Protein backbone atom coordinates (compact mmCIF):
# COMPACT_ATOMS: atom_id res chain seq x y z
CA UNK A 1 0.00 0.00 0.00
CA UNK A 2 1.38 3.43 -0.95
CA UNK A 3 2.03 5.51 2.18
CA UNK A 4 0.20 8.81 2.54
CA UNK A 5 2.50 11.79 1.92
CA UNK A 6 2.96 14.48 4.55
CA UNK A 7 2.72 18.18 3.74
CA UNK A 8 4.38 20.35 6.37
CA UNK A 9 3.19 23.96 6.55
CA UNK A 10 5.17 26.64 8.36
CA UNK A 11 2.55 28.88 9.93
CA UNK A 12 -1.01 28.08 10.97
CA UNK A 13 -2.80 30.97 9.30
CA UNK A 14 -5.50 31.22 6.65
CA UNK A 15 -3.56 29.37 3.92
CA UNK A 16 -2.66 26.47 6.20
CA UNK A 17 -6.24 26.18 7.45
CA UNK A 18 -7.63 26.27 3.89
CA UNK A 19 -5.32 23.49 2.69
CA UNK A 20 -5.93 21.37 5.79
CA UNK A 21 -9.71 21.80 5.47
CA UNK A 22 -9.80 20.70 1.84
CA UNK A 23 -7.49 17.75 2.56
CA UNK A 24 -9.83 16.66 5.36
CA UNK A 25 -12.87 16.91 3.07
CA UNK A 26 -11.12 14.90 0.34
CA UNK A 27 -10.38 12.12 2.83
CA UNK A 28 -14.05 12.15 3.90
CA UNK A 29 -14.93 11.57 0.24
CA UNK A 30 -12.58 8.58 0.11
CA UNK A 31 -10.03 10.43 -2.02
CA UNK A 32 -6.33 10.29 -1.22
CA UNK A 33 -4.95 13.51 0.25
CA UNK A 34 -1.75 14.29 2.14
CA UNK A 35 -1.52 14.59 5.89
CA UNK A 36 -1.23 18.31 6.62
CA UNK A 37 0.89 19.27 9.62
CA UNK A 38 1.30 22.93 10.56
CA UNK A 39 4.30 24.13 12.55
CA UNK A 40 3.31 27.30 14.38
CA UNK A 41 5.22 29.58 16.74
CA UNK A 42 2.32 30.77 18.92
CA UNK A 43 -1.30 30.00 17.97
CA UNK A 44 -3.61 29.30 15.05
CA UNK A 45 -4.36 32.56 13.19
CA UNK A 46 -2.00 34.42 15.54
CA UNK A 47 -1.21 37.19 13.04
CA UNK A 48 -4.86 38.31 13.12
CA UNK A 49 -4.70 38.96 16.86
CA UNK A 50 -2.85 41.51 18.97
CA UNK A 51 -0.36 38.93 20.22
CA UNK A 52 0.85 38.28 16.67
CA UNK A 53 2.30 41.76 16.27
CA UNK A 54 0.60 42.68 12.97
CA UNK A 55 -2.61 44.23 14.33
CA UNK A 56 -4.40 45.17 17.52
CA UNK A 57 -7.20 42.85 16.45
CA UNK A 58 -9.77 45.66 16.27
CA UNK A 59 -9.22 46.87 12.70
CA UNK A 60 -11.47 45.62 9.93
CA UNK A 61 -10.62 42.93 7.41
CA UNK A 62 -9.65 44.49 4.09
CA UNK A 63 -11.44 41.88 1.97
CA UNK A 64 -14.93 40.43 2.11
CA UNK A 65 -15.21 37.67 4.76
CA UNK A 66 -17.11 35.61 2.20
CA UNK A 67 -13.73 35.12 0.54
CA UNK A 68 -13.24 32.38 3.10
CA UNK A 69 -11.26 29.11 3.16
CA UNK A 70 -13.26 27.62 0.27
CA UNK A 71 -13.75 30.66 -1.98
CA UNK A 72 -14.48 30.78 -4.91
CA UNK A 73 -15.94 27.25 -4.58
CA UNK A 74 -14.87 26.28 -8.06
CA UNK A 75 -12.80 23.15 -7.43
CA UNK A 76 -11.21 21.17 -10.22
CA UNK A 77 -9.45 18.46 -8.21
CA UNK A 78 -11.88 15.55 -8.57
CA UNK A 79 -13.45 14.89 -11.99
CA UNK A 80 -17.23 14.37 -11.76
CA UNK A 81 -17.20 15.10 -8.01
CA UNK A 82 -16.06 18.71 -7.87
CA UNK A 83 -19.57 19.99 -7.13
CA UNK A 84 -19.74 17.61 -4.18
CA UNK A 85 -16.33 18.81 -2.97
CA UNK A 86 -17.47 22.44 -3.13
CA UNK A 87 -20.72 21.64 -1.33
CA UNK A 88 -18.85 19.86 1.47
CA UNK A 89 -16.42 22.78 1.79
CA UNK A 90 -19.34 25.15 2.47
CA UNK A 91 -19.59 23.53 5.91
CA UNK A 92 -16.44 25.53 6.74
CA UNK A 93 -17.54 28.79 5.14
CA UNK A 94 -17.83 32.15 6.87
CA UNK A 95 -21.63 31.90 6.80
CA UNK A 96 -21.55 28.41 8.32
CA UNK A 97 -19.35 29.77 11.12
CA UNK A 98 -21.82 32.57 11.82
CA UNK A 99 -24.78 30.18 11.74
CA UNK A 100 -22.96 27.69 13.96
CA UNK A 101 -22.14 30.37 16.53
CA UNK A 102 -25.52 32.12 16.45
CA UNK A 103 -24.28 35.32 14.79
CA UNK A 104 -25.65 35.08 11.25
CA UNK A 105 -28.89 37.07 11.61
CA UNK A 106 -27.16 39.93 13.42
CA UNK A 107 -24.41 40.07 10.78
CA UNK A 108 -26.98 40.33 7.98
CA UNK A 109 -29.06 42.92 9.87
CA UNK A 110 -25.95 45.05 10.38
CA UNK A 111 -25.35 45.15 6.64
CA UNK A 112 -22.81 42.30 6.37
CA UNK A 113 -19.87 44.34 7.70
CA UNK A 114 -16.24 43.30 7.36
CA UNK A 115 -15.28 41.57 10.62
CA UNK A 116 -12.49 42.72 12.88
CA UNK A 117 -9.17 40.92 12.59
CA UNK A 118 -9.90 39.25 15.93
CA UNK A 119 -13.26 37.94 14.68
CA UNK A 120 -11.57 36.62 11.53
CA UNK A 121 -9.04 34.75 13.68
CA UNK A 122 -11.92 33.21 15.63
CA UNK A 123 -13.42 31.99 12.36
CA UNK A 124 -10.12 30.40 11.28
CA UNK A 125 -9.77 28.72 14.67
CA UNK A 126 -13.33 27.43 14.37
CA UNK A 127 -12.43 25.77 11.07
CA UNK A 128 -9.20 24.35 12.52
CA UNK A 129 -11.09 22.91 15.49
CA UNK A 130 -13.79 21.37 13.30
CA UNK A 131 -11.30 19.55 11.05
CA UNK A 132 -9.09 18.55 14.01
CA UNK A 133 -6.14 20.29 12.37
CA UNK A 134 -2.73 18.89 13.29
CA UNK A 135 -0.62 21.72 14.72
CA UNK A 136 2.82 21.40 16.27
CA UNK A 137 3.84 24.39 18.35
CA UNK A 138 7.41 25.57 18.14
CA UNK A 139 9.54 28.24 16.49
CA UNK A 140 11.25 27.12 13.29
CA UNK A 141 15.01 27.47 13.64
CA UNK A 142 16.20 25.73 10.48
CA UNK A 143 14.90 24.17 7.28
CA UNK A 144 16.96 21.37 5.77
CA UNK A 145 16.70 18.46 3.35
CA UNK A 146 17.30 14.88 4.43
CA UNK A 147 17.80 11.75 2.34
CA UNK A 148 16.07 8.47 3.05
CA UNK A 149 15.20 5.17 1.41
CA UNK A 150 12.39 6.87 -0.53
CA UNK A 151 14.32 9.95 -1.61
CA UNK A 152 14.72 13.40 -0.17
CA UNK A 153 12.35 14.95 2.36
CA UNK A 154 12.11 18.32 4.04
CA UNK A 155 13.10 18.61 7.69
CA UNK A 156 11.75 21.50 9.75
CA UNK A 157 13.67 21.96 12.99
CA UNK A 158 12.23 23.49 16.17
CA UNK A 159 13.93 23.53 19.60
CA UNK A 160 11.85 20.53 20.69
CA UNK A 161 11.71 18.32 17.59
CA UNK A 162 12.21 17.86 13.87
CA UNK A 163 9.16 17.54 11.62
CA UNK A 164 9.64 15.69 8.32
CA UNK A 165 7.55 16.18 5.21
CA UNK A 166 7.37 15.07 1.58
CA UNK A 167 6.35 18.62 0.70
CA UNK A 168 6.81 21.95 2.45
CA UNK A 169 4.62 25.06 2.26
CA UNK A 170 5.94 28.28 3.78
CA UNK A 171 3.41 30.96 4.74
CA UNK A 172 3.35 34.10 6.82
CA UNK A 173 4.75 37.61 6.45
CA UNK A 174 7.83 37.10 8.61
CA UNK A 175 8.71 38.84 11.85
CA UNK A 176 7.04 42.17 12.72
CA UNK A 177 9.76 43.09 15.22
CA UNK A 178 12.22 44.50 12.66
CA UNK A 179 12.79 48.25 12.37
CA UNK A 180 15.19 50.71 10.75
CA UNK A 181 16.83 51.45 14.12
CA UNK A 182 16.29 48.54 16.55
CA UNK A 183 16.32 49.34 20.24
CA UNK A 184 15.69 53.07 19.93
CA UNK A 185 12.51 54.16 21.79
CA UNK A 186 11.80 56.77 19.09
CA UNK A 187 11.60 54.07 16.40
CA UNK A 188 8.72 51.61 16.62
CA UNK A 189 8.51 48.31 14.77
CA UNK A 190 5.17 47.03 13.53
CA UNK A 191 4.84 44.83 16.63
CA UNK A 192 5.75 47.64 19.04
CA UNK A 193 3.24 49.99 17.44
CA UNK A 194 0.37 47.50 17.63
CA UNK A 195 1.30 46.51 21.18
CA UNK A 196 0.83 50.15 22.21
CA UNK A 197 -2.45 50.34 20.31
CA UNK A 198 -3.73 47.17 21.97
CA UNK A 199 -2.86 48.64 25.39
CA UNK A 200 -4.73 51.85 24.45
CA UNK A 201 -1.54 53.90 24.86
CA UNK A 202 -1.87 57.23 23.10
CA UNK A 203 1.11 58.37 21.05
CA UNK A 204 1.98 62.03 21.58
CA UNK A 205 4.55 63.52 19.18
CA UNK A 206 4.99 66.54 16.93
CA UNK A 207 6.42 65.02 13.75
CA UNK A 208 5.72 61.34 13.07
CA UNK A 209 6.96 59.36 10.07
CA UNK A 210 5.35 56.15 8.82
CA UNK A 211 7.64 54.18 6.52
CA UNK A 212 5.84 52.18 3.82
CA UNK A 213 3.14 52.61 1.21
CA UNK A 214 1.32 49.28 1.51
CA UNK A 215 -1.69 48.07 3.45
CA UNK A 216 0.39 47.41 6.59
CA UNK A 217 1.35 51.08 6.72
CA UNK A 218 -2.20 52.07 5.78
CA UNK A 219 -3.70 50.27 8.76
CA UNK A 220 -1.18 52.05 11.00
CA UNK A 221 -2.24 55.41 9.58
CA UNK A 222 -5.85 54.47 10.21
CA UNK A 223 -4.95 53.90 13.86
CA UNK A 224 -2.78 57.04 14.15
CA UNK A 225 -5.72 59.32 13.33
CA UNK A 226 -6.93 59.10 16.94
CA UNK A 227 -3.52 59.84 18.50
CA UNK A 228 -2.10 63.22 19.51
CA UNK A 229 0.31 63.93 16.67
CA UNK A 230 0.78 67.19 14.79
CA UNK A 231 1.98 65.92 11.41
CA UNK A 232 2.20 62.45 9.90
CA UNK A 233 4.58 61.97 6.98
CA UNK A 234 4.21 58.83 4.88
CA UNK A 235 7.49 57.73 3.30
CA UNK A 236 7.26 55.41 0.29
CA UNK A 237 9.15 54.89 -3.00
CA UNK A 238 6.09 55.67 -5.12
CA UNK A 239 5.49 59.11 -6.58
CA UNK A 240 2.22 59.29 -4.63
CA UNK A 241 -0.06 57.19 -2.42
CA UNK A 242 -2.00 55.05 -4.86
CA UNK A 243 -5.49 53.74 -4.20
CA UNK A 244 -6.18 50.04 -4.65
CA UNK A 245 -8.63 49.29 -7.44
CA UNK A 246 -11.70 47.68 -5.87
CA UNK A 247 -14.13 47.45 -8.77
CA UNK A 248 -15.47 44.28 -10.38
CA UNK A 249 -12.67 43.99 -12.94
CA UNK A 250 -9.89 44.43 -10.37
CA UNK A 251 -11.53 41.96 -7.99
CA UNK A 252 -11.86 39.39 -10.78
CA UNK A 253 -8.07 39.37 -11.17
CA UNK A 254 -7.84 38.03 -7.62
CA UNK A 255 -10.57 35.39 -7.69
CA UNK A 256 -10.11 34.17 -11.28
CA UNK A 257 -6.49 34.13 -12.54
CA UNK A 258 -7.50 32.69 -15.92
CA UNK A 259 -5.48 34.51 -18.52
CA UNK A 260 -2.89 35.81 -16.04
CA UNK A 261 -0.13 33.66 -17.52
CA UNK A 262 -0.94 35.07 -20.95
CA UNK A 263 0.26 38.51 -19.83
CA UNK A 264 3.87 39.60 -20.18
CA UNK A 265 5.92 40.00 -17.00
CA UNK A 266 5.80 43.78 -17.40
CA UNK A 267 2.00 43.69 -17.72
CA UNK A 268 1.72 41.53 -14.62
CA UNK A 269 4.00 43.81 -12.61
CA UNK A 270 1.92 46.80 -13.70
CA UNK A 271 -1.29 45.06 -12.60
CA UNK A 272 0.23 44.14 -9.22
CA UNK A 273 1.38 47.73 -8.71
CA UNK A 274 -2.14 49.03 -9.35
CA UNK A 275 -4.07 46.46 -7.34
CA UNK A 276 -1.93 44.88 -4.64
CA UNK A 277 1.58 46.07 -3.80
CA UNK A 278 2.20 49.43 -2.20
CA UNK A 279 -1.40 50.62 -2.46
CA UNK A 280 -3.93 51.88 0.09
CA UNK A 281 -7.54 50.78 0.26
CA UNK A 282 -10.23 53.25 -0.78
CA UNK A 283 -11.50 53.32 2.82
CA UNK A 284 -8.11 54.46 4.17
CA UNK A 285 -7.65 56.96 1.33
CA UNK A 286 -11.00 58.54 2.18
CA UNK A 287 -9.86 58.98 5.78
CA UNK A 288 -6.56 60.50 4.60
CA UNK A 289 -8.46 62.99 2.46
CA UNK A 290 -10.22 64.47 5.48
CA UNK A 291 -7.11 64.73 7.70
CA UNK A 292 -4.83 67.68 6.97
CA UNK A 293 -2.02 66.31 9.14
CA UNK A 294 -0.97 63.84 6.44
CA UNK A 295 2.01 64.48 4.16
CA UNK A 296 3.88 62.29 1.67
CA UNK A 297 7.62 62.02 0.96
CA UNK A 298 8.95 59.96 -1.91
CA UNK A 299 12.03 57.85 -1.24
CA UNK A 300 13.54 54.77 0.35
CA UNK A 301 15.11 54.87 3.80
CA UNK A 302 18.84 54.43 3.21
CA UNK A 303 20.02 55.26 6.72
CA UNK A 304 18.65 56.15 10.16
CA UNK A 305 20.47 57.78 13.07
CA UNK A 306 19.46 59.22 16.44
CA UNK A 307 20.69 62.78 16.96
CA UNK A 308 19.66 65.70 19.20
CA UNK A 309 16.58 63.92 20.51
CA UNK A 310 15.24 63.18 17.03
CA UNK A 311 15.53 60.46 14.40
CA UNK A 312 17.20 61.59 11.20
CA UNK A 313 16.25 59.56 8.13
CA UNK A 314 18.31 59.66 4.96
CA UNK A 315 16.00 59.12 1.99
CA UNK A 316 17.29 57.90 -1.36
CA UNK A 317 15.38 58.90 -4.50
CA UNK A 318 16.13 58.11 -8.12
CA UNK A 319 15.61 61.00 -10.52
CA UNK A 320 16.49 59.83 -13.97
CA UNK A 321 20.00 58.39 -13.87
CA UNK A 322 20.86 60.33 -10.72
CA UNK A 323 20.42 59.10 -7.14
CA UNK A 324 19.63 61.91 -4.70
CA UNK A 325 19.80 61.72 -0.92
CA UNK A 326 17.97 64.03 1.48
CA UNK A 327 17.87 64.10 5.29
CA UNK A 328 14.68 64.63 7.32
CA UNK A 329 14.17 64.77 11.09
CA UNK A 330 11.26 63.25 13.05
CA UNK A 331 10.26 62.91 16.69
CA UNK A 332 8.95 59.38 16.13
CA UNK A 333 9.39 56.87 13.30
CA UNK A 334 7.07 53.91 12.78
CA UNK A 335 8.53 51.31 10.45
CA UNK A 336 5.58 49.88 8.54
CA UNK A 337 7.60 48.96 5.48
CA UNK A 338 5.67 45.75 5.30
CA UNK A 339 5.98 42.03 5.11
CA UNK A 340 8.98 40.21 3.70
CA UNK A 341 7.72 37.30 1.61
CA UNK A 342 11.27 35.87 1.54
CA UNK A 343 11.69 36.02 5.33
CA UNK A 344 12.50 32.29 5.46
CA UNK A 345 15.72 32.42 3.39
CA UNK A 346 18.01 32.88 6.44
CA UNK A 347 16.50 29.68 7.92
CA UNK A 348 17.59 27.50 4.98
CA UNK A 349 20.44 25.11 5.71
CA UNK A 350 23.25 24.70 3.20
CA UNK A 351 21.73 21.51 1.78
CA UNK A 352 18.41 23.31 1.18
CA UNK A 353 20.20 26.29 -0.39
CA UNK A 354 22.13 23.97 -2.71
CA UNK A 355 18.92 22.17 -3.72
CA UNK A 356 17.14 25.42 -4.56
CA UNK A 357 20.06 26.98 -6.43
CA UNK A 358 20.42 23.81 -8.48
CA UNK A 359 16.72 23.98 -9.42
CA UNK A 360 16.86 27.71 -10.11
CA UNK A 361 20.02 27.39 -12.15
CA UNK A 362 21.65 30.27 -10.31
CA UNK A 363 21.87 32.23 -7.06
CA UNK A 364 18.90 32.26 -4.71
CA UNK A 365 17.05 35.57 -4.30
CA UNK A 366 13.51 36.80 -3.82
CA UNK A 367 13.33 37.76 -7.51
CA UNK A 368 14.59 34.41 -8.83
CA UNK A 369 12.17 32.54 -6.56
CA UNK A 370 9.20 34.66 -7.70
CA UNK A 371 9.92 34.00 -11.36
CA UNK A 372 10.29 30.24 -10.78
CA UNK A 373 6.89 29.56 -9.14
CA UNK A 374 4.89 27.08 -11.21
CA UNK A 375 1.17 26.32 -11.59
CA UNK A 376 1.15 24.29 -8.37
CA UNK A 377 2.60 27.31 -6.47
CA UNK A 378 5.85 25.40 -5.93
CA UNK A 379 9.36 26.27 -7.08
CA UNK A 380 9.84 24.64 -10.49
CA UNK A 381 12.50 21.95 -10.95
CA UNK A 382 12.86 21.39 -7.20
CA UNK A 383 12.13 18.04 -5.53
CA UNK A 384 10.86 17.60 -2.83
CA UNK A 385 8.20 20.21 -3.48
CA UNK A 386 8.56 23.66 -1.91
CA UNK A 387 5.30 25.64 -2.07
CA UNK A 388 5.66 29.41 -1.76
CA UNK A 389 2.20 30.97 -2.23
CA UNK A 390 3.42 34.27 -0.81
CA UNK A 391 5.76 34.63 -3.79
CA UNK A 392 3.34 33.33 -6.44
CA UNK A 393 1.60 36.57 -7.39
CA UNK A 394 3.88 37.43 -10.30
CA UNK A 395 3.60 34.13 -12.15
CA UNK A 396 0.20 32.80 -11.04
CA UNK A 397 -2.02 35.73 -10.06
CA UNK A 398 -2.41 38.37 -7.35
CA UNK A 399 -4.98 36.45 -5.32
CA UNK A 400 -2.70 33.62 -4.20
CA UNK A 401 -0.40 35.58 -1.84
CA UNK A 402 -3.37 36.96 0.13
CA UNK A 403 -6.90 35.90 1.13
CA UNK A 404 -8.63 36.37 -2.20
CA UNK A 405 -8.81 32.79 -3.52
CA UNK A 406 -7.97 30.33 -0.74
CA UNK A 407 -10.08 27.64 -2.40
CA UNK A 408 -8.06 27.88 -5.62
CA UNK A 409 -4.85 27.91 -3.60
CA UNK A 410 -5.73 24.65 -1.86
CA UNK A 411 -6.67 23.12 -5.23
CA UNK A 412 -3.28 23.97 -6.72
CA UNK A 413 -1.30 22.62 -3.77
CA UNK A 414 -3.31 19.45 -3.14
CA UNK A 415 -3.31 18.72 -6.87
CA UNK A 416 0.49 18.63 -6.94
CA UNK A 417 2.49 15.40 -6.94
CA UNK A 418 3.99 15.54 -3.47
CA UNK A 419 5.21 11.94 -3.27
CA UNK A 420 5.55 10.03 -0.03
CA UNK A 421 8.18 8.85 2.39
CA UNK A 422 7.66 6.04 4.87
CA UNK A 423 4.89 5.93 7.43
CA UNK A 424 7.52 5.77 10.19
CA UNK A 425 8.86 9.14 9.10
CA UNK A 426 5.51 10.91 9.23
CA UNK A 427 5.28 14.06 11.28
CA UNK A 428 4.98 13.70 15.01
CA UNK A 429 1.56 14.05 16.64
CA UNK A 430 0.53 17.58 17.46
CA UNK A 431 0.63 18.96 20.95
CA UNK A 432 -2.65 19.94 22.50
CA UNK A 433 -4.04 22.87 20.56
CA UNK A 434 -4.74 26.12 22.35
PLM segments and residue spans:
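Conserved N-terminal glycine-rich FAD pyrophosphate-binding loop of Rossmann-like flavoproteins
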Residues: 42-83, 241-259
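Short linear sequence motifs
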Residues: 64-66, 85-90, 113-119, 273
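A conserved beta-strand/loop capping segment in the N-terminal third of enzymes
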Residues: 73-107
